[in-house]
Amino acid sequence: PGTLERLGLDPEVLHRTNPGLVVTRVTGFGQTGPYKDRPGFATQAEALSGFAAINGEPDGQPLLPPIALTDEVAALVAAFATMVAVHSGVGQVVDVNLIESMLQLMGPLVPLYGLRGEVQERLGAGIPYTVPRNTYRTSDGRWVAVSTSAESVAERVMDLIGLGDDPRFGDFSGRVAHRDLIDERMAEWMAARTMEQVLAEFEAAHAAVAPVYDMAD
């Protein structure tokens, strides 16, 4: 904050020259407020926004993303906001900061706490509202990612791994309550098959799966 002013490029000065100018500012914590003069990078926003707190194993440390995720998100927010401002035809200042950009990624977690007092815990690669949802190792040492966000898909996956007749896993709440048991069964099922076999069986069952690729793939 204040860099434009120190350079003599205060938005008020610029707007006197060009009233239609859109000035976009991106900082760690915004132009005002108690944190405005603090140094801030992606790491700080990932920590303060609550993002790191939900990443990692339940009994492990909070994990930071291995890329500058916040920088990418804030850049998209700034680009979108700038386009909207330009389209409006009104000169203005677009004030984007890293932490607010990351808070947008937190989605329902903010009102979940505000309305119900619930704080999402770390679940490794899992998420609270989908079971199973994880990465699993196949017999040939490859990895696949599974998600069952739709009830019909979850039912097909339960049938596929031999748990379809167990009433404990017949609905969402039952699967969530037995997350660890289902994960163990899924891991066993995957470990008995190659990645090619896993992909073929999931495709035949119309269930969602994808190989875990790196850049070389």
Task: Please provide the spans of the model-predicted regions.
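Short acidic, glycine-rich surface-loop motifs adjacent to enzyme active sites
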Residues: P1-T3
